[in-house]
């Protein structure tokens, strides 16, 4: 099999693949076997119909088309592997020349275009300086954390005043579309300002008093009319506010393992300090990505971005929202650029993903969705998403390696210890040889690199071939 590779653009490649009759023969044999098992011909059992009879009843043209369709994916995969092409998205195949359908002589000529990962030049990582906020813990920070803990032990008390943010409203809801009632809910307890119910509900309830009713328009969040605008009538039955317990020794003993409120405050101070240190690490990672994206030119296939944007908007039922489309386009392009950048770093730094790392990552993912880990892994496997998880781990490790080479200081000029956020280059083998960034050239939402080509309309056979 001969393949020529033509670079159409930094992100688009054309493969011209020439397949000899000998190389196509296994697919032709399989085509005869498959057709023999499908057709009903008197005098022959299924699967036992001779090729000559299939030629008479079905036709060699059908056999050839079946063989080409069956072999196309394999020819493409082999060409990609032999020529070290790194695809992104779904390839498009055109059959330029067919073998002679009378005796299957002559080469099969395939032309396949595919978006590819661009070649990028990585900068030196030494000398990068990042500045993050100082992790200073104030008394107000500690009291804020204490109040959050107290709110978990609060009681709700009915009050006679207008509702405001932070109150719990006891409400009834009625949704109408075109004057017809489509949904109702009674006696719901909702925290005003949480944004967890329906768009516009916080503004509608603000300053409302018990017994009052108001109407507003908003898209429904679920049900048969999800996404449709409806007239929402909300009736406020009661307003309740949190009553926090006293911050004393009794509260410390009830809410923690400590005997005194002083000990509890000291423990909360440590929690706040750890949270701020974690925030420094997160901020440093984000800054590092932004700085690297500024330093490296990374073109992204336009179709790849457009496909992702369309999927996103379709899920949100906002295909006609041009303003939101622009926002999603910018976000998607940045996401792809970041993934390409980190994959390149992972490859240069020889990042490997061990089975233990993958297992830990999957267990954490299952916990986020409150799922059994085995069931979570099963679903990911059925949807071909395991390799995407491997890629995500590799990217995180790649970023941690670069972060370890950067100088991180706070706004006071003090060196920041980010030991928990950095990593050293791998020098061992991954447990799973396939668990490398190359398995995930495409992000989770993309078509995998070895996806079967999408065949265009085939060129008509010449009259001399028939």
Swiss-Prot record:
One of its GO terms (biological process) is 'de novo' cotranslational protein folding. It comes from Leifsonia xyli subsp. xyli (strain CTCB07). Consists of 3 domains; the N-terminus binds the ribosome, the middle domain has PPIase activity, while the C-terminus has intrinsic chaperone activity on its own. The keyword Cell cycle applies. NCBIfam families: tig (TIGR00115). Signal peptide: none annotated. Involved in protein export. Acts as a chaperone by maintaining the newly synthesized protein in an open conformation. Functions as a peptidyl-prolyl cis-trans isomerase. GO terms for cellular component: cytoplasm. Residues 453-466 have a biased composition (Basic residues). Residues 426-444 have a biased composition (Acidic residues). InterPro entries: PPIase_dom_sf, PPIase_FKBP_dom, Trig_fac, Trigger_fac_C, Trigger_fac_C_sf, Trigger_fac_ribosome-bd_bac, Trigger_fac_ribosome-bd_sf, Trigger_fact/SurA_dom_sf. This is Trigger factor. It comes from the Bacteria. Keywords: Cell cycle, Cell division, Chaperone, Cytoplasm, Isomerase, Rotamase. The keyword Chaperone applies. Residues 166-245 form the PPIase FKBP-type domain. Residues 313-332, 424-466 are annotated as: Disordered. Belongs to the FKBP-type PPIase family. Tig subfamily. One of its GO terms (molecular function) is ribosome binding. Its EC number is 5.2.1.8. It holds the Pfam family Trigger_C. PROSITE patterns: FKBP_PPIASE. Gene3D superfamilies: 3.10.50.40, Trigger factor ribosome-binding domain, Trigger factor, C-terminal domain. It catalyses: [protein]-peptidylproline (omega=180) = [protein]-peptidylproline (omega=0). It is found in: Cytoplasm.
